[in-house]
Amino acid sequence: SRIPKTDPQTVTAPTGDIRAVLLHLGRNMWCDYPTEHMGALSPESIETLTMKPRLSIAWSDERWRQVVDYAAAAGINMIVIDLGEGLQYPSHPELAVEGTWSVEKMRAEIKYMNERGIEAIPKLNFSTSHNGWMGDYSHMVSSKPYYRMCEDVIRDVVEIFGGPRFFHIGLDEERAAFQEDQTSQYICARKGEYWWRD
């Protein structure tokens, strides 16, 4: 296997109920959809759905720690971190934006959570409707460079998180209707082919 063997996190895994929250470190999870395909939506919804890439991460260091402390005080024992462009991937530094966390920063935050009884779980969303964080790779779905990038960043994250117990890969809203709906094929098109020809 090309996935590295690592030592598990030093936090004791939750027993009994898992009480978890999802936090988005990156903000470029959504694609820029053409509004003419969205139907009757409110102006606020259209603005959200047609977001341009954001060039900074979602959190200040102070706010992140406040939320982690609040979660611990509320009895949360797991935080799923939607990484996106919020982590500096050693294999793909081109995915970083302003404020992207270094490997050392992420490890320090994982340690901070572990010390408060919170297990850190990584999430990378590979759904074609939430892959804006991939930059140019989001337009290469199902290609060899795309799969190489996916493998690389998964390997990076497994190592950085110290062999997490879980790894969330997103893929919400990934369904057969995207393959059938001609208005959605722009999401999946790559060099004249479509994703279902794998």
Over which residues does each language-model region extend?
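Feature activates predominantly on carbohydrate-active enzymes
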Residues: 2-198
